[in-house]
Amino acid sequence: APYRISDLELASRLSFFLWSSVPDDELLDAAIDGTLHQPEVLEAQTRRMLAHARADALVENFAGQWLYLRNVPALTPDEDLFPDFGAALREAFQQETELFFESILHEDRGVLEFLTADYTFVNERLARHYGIPNIYGSHFRRITLVDDTRRGLLGHGSILTLTSYATRTSPVLRGKWILENLLSSPPPPPPPNVPALDETSDDGRPRSMREAMEQHRANPVCASCHKLM
């Protein structure tokens, strides 16, 4: 049954959520004197904790779980098809999104900024991958995006690679990720025994990705979910 938590319990939950660690003395003092549950005290403590270096744990752990960034180190696109991909680019992908998440958090921006932001963070390696000129050095800096297709999370290399196969992009994986992670509306499991897409047209020509996806949308069993994705 629901119950009102104590100030000490509140301090513990707040600290482990924001810092992934135990409360510090200042937070414990507010809990012990019974004022932590007061809205103005709770807000002040939360803002103080978010401004602390220990809040880096929130970026790493929360973004890692919510956006699947913790899976980025295991990404291995096909090296024959993507010979330019390597450890430096993989690490830059992850750091870009972590810095982006951190900026929205510390600047108290709206949640829609995750999808619409006209800025990102790049170093020389990542800028070269994105085709952005005049960026030099390994350090990351904030830039304004000229290319609208790069706006927000859905333009980040980390998210695009996480929602692709090793050999090609995948609108289905990407749509599923959006439904699950951004809209909290996961699609139902696919029906059993769904055949692989026919990647060759009747005249022997390779199908475009749009043509291949039309096969699923034309199948009534698959269409309801694939129209969403």
Pin down the residues of each PLM region.
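Short, well-ordered loop/turn and helix-capping segments at boundaries between secondary-structure elements
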Residues: 16-20, 24, 33, 52, ...
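Contiguous, well-ordered alpha-helical segments that form the cores/surfaces of helical PPI scaffolds
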Residues: 12-16, 124
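Short, well-structured beta-strand/strand-turn elements
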Residues: 26, 130-142
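Surface-exposed patches in mature extracellular/periplasmic domains of secreted proteins
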Residues: 58-62, 109-116, 137-139, 178
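Extended, non-catalytic substrate-recognition/exosite surfaces adjacent to catalytic cores, especially
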Residues: 82-124, 128, 143, 147-156, ...
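Active/binding-pocket-proximal capping segment
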Residues: 118-121, 133-134, 197, 229
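Long, ordered, helix-rich scaffold segments
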Residues: 1-12, 23-106, 113, 163
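Sequence context surrounding c-type heme c attachment/ligation sites in exported
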Residues: 1, 127, 142-229
